[in-house]
Design a protein with these regions (language model features):
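Intracellular alpha-helical coupling/juxtamembrane segments of multi-pass membrane proteins
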Residues: 258-291, 295-301, 305-312
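ABC ATP-binding cassette signature C-motif
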Residues: 1-271, 315, 322-562
Length: 562
């Protein structure tokens, strides 16, 4: 997957099946070149993580051959990385530079030996010490080891790692992933395998990571649904489709164009998926001003969206979101709201007014109070000061991150259908299995017990549960986490055609840019800024307001010298 680089890794006829009738990978032949940047995309369950585990050497049960060129190292970021719970955060990060730590320790040990009689009275031992000291000095100079502490601080700051003395056993899932990523980047393996690297990173950390990987000398292979990440970093896209591995040269936007053309040649009648791809490609090709105009037009088209023919929408969209009852002019208004937990003030004097058909993206660092905002609106927690005024016509539908209302003992089909073959959706009865298929649950997947679902599958199921409740105001907490690009694209279109108001917590910049009419930004220091416009427009506005001097902003610097 490059034109003039050395092949460092090949897969020859690799196949993998989990059951006799479910082959995930089929006879894959691929060669990877040193320095290539490869993004892997495909539906959930298409074998992306399995492929990564095969390359990492963690999955041994497969057919075919995996061949590495000698002398190359491999590093792997799993979705749930293993960390030593007995260590502190910094001790785990330092594992990534253990060879440098060992070199410095040996250098200090040699210096101490110079003062011992058994060495300075023996010329041969002294010569050996001087020789070894010179070797170590060369290594220290080459790796800039004297500045190791500042590099560790830079890496931990860039990825928003928790305090360095924090015990690993007390870290959240997101914190563990950030610590594992920090350790891996410091290791600098020749082949860097990243499974959903942008999950649990805020926008500034993602921006830093993109710049780091653009300059990374080795090969980077990343499974991700973050399309801006794929656009900025990837030089190749590897699509996994029904077991086949299809390489495409270029970034995500290039793949979108090539894929659309290929589907156009293969299909006599345009499928829903092809039309969805074509509409996303149209958006990619839009000039910034045209995108802005599209967002503003939505705010003036409530009646048009509300009165669109439901059957036409269902035929057009992969994910159809029923509009719910008609919204009045008042949706939700925050007036002087404040909330704190002990000494930690999340926000103070929060004010905003949601428009009837706006799509509001909620952004900010982890722990800033975004989920708390939703819980306050839902009445699950109480404000310390101020009020949330909810309009009389509002019917809320809430998708949270915990998915607590999913019964682990029931199947996916039982949870959605409630034992009925037909479910009510948008004043129409539709087949429950057909509804589930829109969220990428095929026949066998619909019979899975909910307790056995992956994170992405649970996310899709909860989304399907909430959207069929026919709310006219949707509160979606990280709906884009752990779902594949196809489902993301379908969700974007469903929201774009939804006549009501949606408030969406997400770190997915492409998603935010494509659908949002407003941004509610948690900017630090308990400040929350409500902005009319897309994510990109908000970023421009933020730069004008805060400039490069804004102290929370991570500016890119290399972790280690080459």
């Amino acid at each position: 997957m490059a034109d003039d680089k050395k092949i460092i890794f090949s897969m020859v006829g690799v196949s993998k099946a989990f059951q006799a009738n479910k082959q995930v990978l089929k006879d894959i032949y691929l060669s990877f070149f040193y320095g290539a940047k490869i993004g892997i995309i495909g539906l959930n369950g298409s074998g992306k993580s399995t492929l990564m585990k095969i390359i990492a050497g963690l999955e041994k049960s497969y057919q075919g051959e995996v061949v590495f060129s000698p002398g190359y190292s491999v590093g792997y970021l799993a979705q749930e990385p293993h960390l030593d719970d007995e260590k502190t955060m910094k001790e785990v990060v330092m594992e990534g530079v253990q060879s440098i730590v060992d070199t410095l320790a040996e250098y200090e040990e040699i210096n101490n030996k110079f003062g011992l009689p058994e060495y300075y009275e023996d010329s041969e031992k002294m010569d050996a010490l001087f020789a070894r000291q010179a070797e170590l000095q060369d290594i220290i100079d080459a790796t800039d080891a004297w500045n190791l502490d500042s590099k560790l601080e830079r890496a931990m700051d860039a990825l928003r790692c928790p305090p360095e003395d924090q015990p690993v056993k007390n870290l959240s899932g997101g914190e563990r992933r950030r610590v594992a990523l920090c350790r891996l980047l410091l290791q600098k393996p020749d082949i860097l395998l990243l499974d959903e690297p942008t999950n649990h990173l805020d926008a500034e950390s993602i921006d830093w990571l993109e710049q780091h990987l653009q300059q990374y000398e080795g090969t980077v292979i990343a499974v991700t649904h973050d399309r801006y990440f794929l656009d900025h970093v990837a030089g190749w896209i590897l699509e996994l489709d029904r077991g086949e591995g299809i390489p495409w040269k270029g970034n995500y936007s290039s793949w979108l164009e090539q894929k659309t053309k290929r589907m156009e040649m293969e299909e006599k009648v345009a499928s829903k998926r092809r039309k969805t791809l074509e509409r996303e490609l149209d958006w990619v090709r839009m000039a910034p001003k045209a995108r802005q105009a599209k967002g503003k037009a939505r705010l003036n088209s409530y009646d048009k969206l509300l009165n669109e023919d439901v059957k036409e929408k269902e035929e057009k969209l992969e994910i159809f979101i029923p509009n719910g009852p008609r919204l009045g002019n008042k949706v939700i208004e925050a007036k002087g709201v404040a909330k704190a937990y002990g000494d930690k003030l999340l926000f103070d004097n929060l004010n905003f007014m949601l428009p009837p058909n706006g799509i509001v993206g909620v952004i900010g660092p982890n722990g800033a109070g975004k989920t708390t905002l939703f819980r306050l609106i839902m009445g699950l927690e109480t404000v310390d000061k101020g009020t949330f005024e909810v309009g009389e016509t509002v019917k809320l539908a809430y998708v949270d991150q915990q998915h607590k209302d999913i019964d682990p003992a029931k199947s996916v089909y039982q949870v959605i259908s409630g034992g009925n073959e037909l479910i009510r959706l948008g004043n129409r009865d539709i087949n429950a299995r057909a509804y589930l298929s829109r969220f990428n649950f095929s026949g066998a997947d619909q019979e899975k017990l909910c307790g056995m679902l992956s994170g992405g599958e649970r996310n899709r199921l909860h989304l399907a549960m909430a959207l069929k409740e026919e709310g006219n105001v949707l509160l979606l907490d990280e709906p884009t986490n752990d779902i594949d690009v196809n489902t993301l694209r379908a969700l974007e279109e469903g929201l774009d055609d939804f006549a009501g108001c949606a408030v969406v917590i997400s770190h997915d910049r492409w998603f935010l840019d494509r659908i949002c009419t407003h941004i509610l930004a948690f900017e630090g220091n308990s400040e929350v800024f409500f902005f009319e416009g897309s994510y990109s427009e908000y970023e421009e506005n933020k730069m004008k307001r805060l400039g490069n001097e804004e102290p929370k902003r991570v500016r890119y610097r290399k972790l280690m010298e080459d």
